[in-house]
UniProtKB/Swiss-Prot annotation:
Binds 1 Mn(2+) or Fe(3+) ion per subunit. Pfam families: Sod_Fe_C (PF02777), Sod_Fe_N (PF00081). Mn(2+) binds at residues 10, 64. This is Superoxide dismutase [Mn/Fe]. GO terms for cellular component: cytoplasm. GO terms for molecular function: metal ion binding; superoxide dismutase activity. Its cofactor is Mn(2+); Fe(3+). Destroys superoxide anion radicals which are normally produced within the cells and which are toxic to biological systems. Catalyzes the dismutation of superoxide anion radicals into O2 and H2O2 by successive reduction and oxidation of the transition metal ion at the active site. Keywords: Iron, Manganese, Metal-binding, Oxidoreductase. It catalyses: 2 superoxide + 2 H(+) = H2O2 + O2. Fe(3+) binds at residues 10, 64.
Amino acid sequence: HIDAETMTLHHDKHHATYVANANAALEKHPEIGEDLEALLSDVDALPADIRQALINNGGGHLNHALFWELLSPEKTEISAELAADIDETFGSFDAFKEAFTTAATTRFGSGWAFLVVNPKGKLEVISTANQDTPITQGLKPILAL
């Protein structure tokens, strides 16, 4: 359970600030476009003067956007395909939950736990510091906390 005050703080303050700061960085180099996923998939190609701002704030925006997208007031079931992939990778859904919980609760300081798809199409649980997004590592996040 996450309380309403924490959710409001993350939505109205943190996420809004990441969006504003990412947009401010992008305004300095309109020639690179605005597709944050594409830009963050090759951070070395970013202009040096905005690279860290986009890593921090673009990552913060993408991480929060995925988190909000996945929230639902109703309990939902995962797809049969994802359930099978989880069983294949982790052995069981309970083992996945344990791995994900460990990733979320053992991060020192601020950060995220993710279920990602790696370039080989396999699932992994990872943890990133601060607002680092798995996209910079060539991973596709499908669950974020």
